[in-house]
Amino acid sequence: MFCYQCQETAKGTGCTLKGVCGKAATTSAAMDLLLAVSRGVGIVSDALNRAGAAKDEKEIGHFLCDALFCTITNANFDDADILQRVEKGITLRNRLVKLADENGVTLPERAELRWDGSKASYAEEAKRQGVLRIANEDIRSLKELTIYGLKGMAAYYEHASNLQQEDLTLIHFMAEALAIVADPEADQATLIDLVLRTGQAGVKAMALLDKANTSAYGSPVITKVNLGVGSNPGILIS
């Protein structure tokens, strides 16, 4: 395994045996597969978007947000649950590939589209799809920075969506960003621009979540509360 997505990572360079957070190597491998499948879905979805082809936007958005959110630190360490998402993603990716073929949409040659998703190949495919698959450290860092931005954006979007607030332009951006991350020819200039655009999209997602929360619960106001100690059990809300 190799993971350096949080500031607590081992020696400040990356966890390679087990995560400081407690994440097992098998869980890290499952997450690498899920991210690879997400890139595959993103590649095809982005190509369909550019061609103006109709598709199930809600299903794509739900999968991408759920998959990316699932891989943030301490969100989900259940290997079987993560691998179920991998299977779901493979099914969605294959369906989108078929849709692209039916609409005459040409897809790029990418490793994320070649893997057949067979369970017997999980372990080997995870090794090929990890963070270190990218040799150039600068390119790797820019792509990973984008991915971490997308993960945060996915979390905001999923919470907003649960409160009936959605914005398909953000889902389209996720697909585009994943497609660029999957492109082995993407250069530093392209990726620096992508990082900045990811930040802009993240702010837009935060605004969407704020709208969702205030629409559902109202705007926060200064309120007096009891700071005393009670006799019954309570819940601390920060």
Provide a role label for each language-model segment.
Residues M1-S238:
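Metallocofactor- and cofactor-centric catalytic cores in central/energy metabolism, strongly enriched
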